[in-house]
Amino acid sequence: MKNFLPIVKLACLAAVAALIVSCGGGADYRNLLPADSFMTMSVNPASLMEKSGACDATCNPLLDRLKAELGKAENLSAEESEYLLSLLENPAESGLDLKKDLFMFMSMSGADINNPEVRGGLLFPVGDKSKLDALIARINEKSGTEAVTENGVSVVKIGEDTAATGVCAYNDIACMLYFQTCGGDIEAKVRGLFAQKQGESLMGDKAVAEQLARKNDVNMVLSYGAILPMMNNPMLSSMPMMDALKGMTMVGSVNFEKGRIVTEAAVSYKDKESEAKMMDFYAYVKPQTGALLRYVPAASIGAMSLGLNGEKLYSMLSAMPGYGMLMANPMVK
């Protein structure tokens, strides 16, 4: 009996651990998204292919055209052509999980907005690592590159002789194509993204995480705080609303439905102070009640109503660089 109790305890602990993992405690490929991205977009390929009718390989004009072009390729062996054809007909053979969202992200930095340092890439979820290993091995053999694996993350350097250096990095959870135009150790940067925790990534932003959890054809995230440092302009930086913009993030979605495209957008703030600053800046805009709609012709396809508080509008413009002297003119007052 004494020997039986420890076994029961271990079984209970194992059951609890399995339950925790099954409830979402496992690794999330989205945790690789850089927190400094000013623009991030997700696309659900499975949903778009289903809605476009592209899932049926037997009657897909694009697939037929790609097959025809593949047949013209002279530098491919019969076996290579057959393999590529299988990928076209069933993209899941690549090892990527195309039932989940794929992501595109971009960051910018530097003092010159006309010549910024750009970083960005694509992030894919991995469904079958053995198939992805086979695909990468074929590419390496064909291109003369090789994968360097450390701590479970394999990295292949690409485009080293071009203006933008890049890498393909992957493990059993995610595959990332990452490029940058600036100098620095790009491999170390990418390995850092694979090692970061949720709180260090873009998913650490609650509003962003909630948006990306929604089942949409396309999700978009635009972080004003990540792009404002690029605007190295004294007039822009001195505008009253700049402090509020630093804590502002816009999230939105696009869904393709029969006969229409549905879009939604919302703005979130990192704290109540940033939200209060923005609300104070736009205090010159009067809320609309819809009372003016009675004067709009019934056949109109659209209408816009805008109300302004003249005194608050004057105060706002007076605080704007370049407008202060104009607003101080007695004739303007």
Task: Locate the predicted segments by residue.
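Charged, amphipathic alpha-helical scaffolding segments
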Residues: 31, 165-189, 255-282
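Structural boundary/hinge residues at secondary-structure and domain interfaces
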Residues: 23-155, 202-247, 261-333
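A conserved glycine-rich beta-strand in the N-terminal activation segment of trypsin-fold
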Residues: 155-231
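Short, flexible helical or helix-coil boundary motifs
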Residues: 12-15, 143, 197
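Sec-dependent bacterial lipoprotein signal peptides
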Residues: 1-21
